[in-house]
């Protein structure tokens, strides 16, 4: 019998078997490596060892992910059992005490307060579980996002292409904006949930004739209805372009990419921030158009056909 009030931590059978499977595979791999080492020359053993280490590292990464799953589900099981026990105790206490009489307008506020007090720990538990799950998924997404970023940097003008071909952004971009964007090598979007929901947009540039900044950061506070400007990196225009930047900013008072880029508090700029955070960052490839390679025996023209 387990002590009263203690919790049983059950590891789900699916995860336990998967974790054991990883352990058996790693053990078999090491044993096989040892046997092969007696049959080959030292050079072959050294080459094989590198492969074994690589396989063991891969198995180790899988084991870590499985362990994350196990710990997450163990915590959920423990929390669920604790919640069940608390509910049972509350039910026993309610059965021992005579039930309340008919609800009246005078007694309703007290009853609502009692219910709210019971609800608070449940809400706190839900927030913790959601936060752990979000952090876990962010860890899993990161290597894929890093790999995607490395591939994108090998494609010249990728982000200029993507932004210019977005159905809403295309109407807000001029030819000069497009040229400025051609120097952009990377885009990163990050989100923070605590203490406030914050969306951070980082635009990375190589050397260009417009400004000195290598990174432009724009931050927005996010709520249910809107993105609200919070902070932006001041743009360090080159002296040769500063007058033109001032002219462009004051010549056109309508919403466009340049006004968003140069003036963080420009009216309506939250629309562009929302497009970048919620659409372009999540799947830029859907807006990228590739140049169609010229067919053999044909001359390449300036207006090469685009492929979706």
Curated annotation (Swiss-Prot):
PTM annotation, UniProt: Phosphorylated.
Keyword Cytoplasm: yes
rRNA processing recorded as keyword: no
GO biological process assignments: cell differentiation; gonadal mesoderm development; nucleosome assembly; sex differentiation; spermatogenesis
Subcellular location: Cytoplasm; Nucleus
Keyword terms of this UniProt record: Cytoplasm, Developmental protein, Differentiation, Gonadal differentiation, Nucleus, Phosphoprotein, Spermatogenesis
SUPFAM superfamilies registered for this protein in UniProt: NAP-like
GO molecular function list: chromatin binding; histone binding
GO cellular component terms, A-Z: chromatin; cytoplasm; nucleus
Domain of life of the source: Eukaryota
Record's note on what induces expression: Up-regulated by androgen in a prostate cancer cell line.
Distribution of this protein across tissues and organs: Specifically expressed in testicular tissues. Isoform 1 and isoform 2 are expressed in spermatogonia and spermatocytes. Found in early testicular carcinoma in situ, spermatogonial cells in testicular tissues of 46,X,Y female and in prostate cancer cell lines.
Function (record text): May be involved in sperm differentiation and proliferation.
Disease: TSPY is located in the gonadoblastoma critical region and is preferentially expressed in tumor germ cells of gonadoblastoma specimens. Expression also correlates with testicular seminoma and tumorigenesis of the prostate gland.
Family in the record: Belongs to the nucleosome assembly protein (NAP) family.
This protein's name: Testis-specific Y-encoded protein 1
Gene: TSPY1
């Amino acid at each position: 019998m387990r002590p009263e009030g203690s919790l049983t931590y059950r590891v789900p059978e699916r995860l336990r078997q998967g974790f054991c499977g990883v352990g058996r595979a790693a053990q078999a791999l090491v044993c096989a490596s040892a046997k092969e080492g007696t049959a080959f020359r030292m050079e072959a053993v050294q080459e094989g060892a590198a492969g074994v280490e690589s396989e063991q590292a891969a198995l180790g990464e899988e084991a870590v992910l499985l362990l994350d799953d196990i710990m997450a589900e163990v915590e959920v099981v423990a929390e669920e059992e604790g919640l069940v026990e608390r509910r049972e105790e509350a039910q026993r206490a309610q059965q021992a005490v005579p039930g309340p009489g008919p609800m009246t307008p005078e007694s309703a506020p007290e009853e609502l307060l009692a219910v709210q007090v019971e609800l608070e720990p449940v809400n706190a538990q839900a927030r913790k579980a959601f936060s752990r799950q979000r952090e876990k998924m962010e860890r899993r997404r990161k290597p894929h996002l890093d790999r995607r970023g490395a591939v994108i940097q090998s494609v010249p003008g990728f982000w200029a292409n993507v932004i210019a071909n977005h159905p809403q952004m295309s109407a807000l971009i001029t030819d000069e904006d497009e040229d400025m964007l051609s120097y952009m090598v990377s885009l990163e979007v990050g989100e923070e949930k605590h203490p406030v929901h914050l969306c951070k947009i980082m635009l990375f540039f190589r050397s260009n004739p417009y400004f000195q900044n290598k990174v432009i950061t724009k931050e927005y506070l996010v709520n249910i209805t809107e993105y609200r400007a919070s902070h932006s990196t001041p743009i360090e225009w080159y002296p040769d372009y500063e007058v033109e930047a001032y002219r462009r900013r004051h010549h056109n008072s309508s919403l466009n990419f340049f006004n968003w880029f140069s003036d963080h508090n420009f009216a309506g700029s939250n629309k562009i921030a929302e497009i970048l955070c919620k659409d372009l960052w999540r799947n830029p490839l859907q807006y990228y158009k590739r140049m169609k390679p010229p067919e053999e025996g044909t001359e390449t023209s300036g207006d090469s056909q685009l492929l979706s």
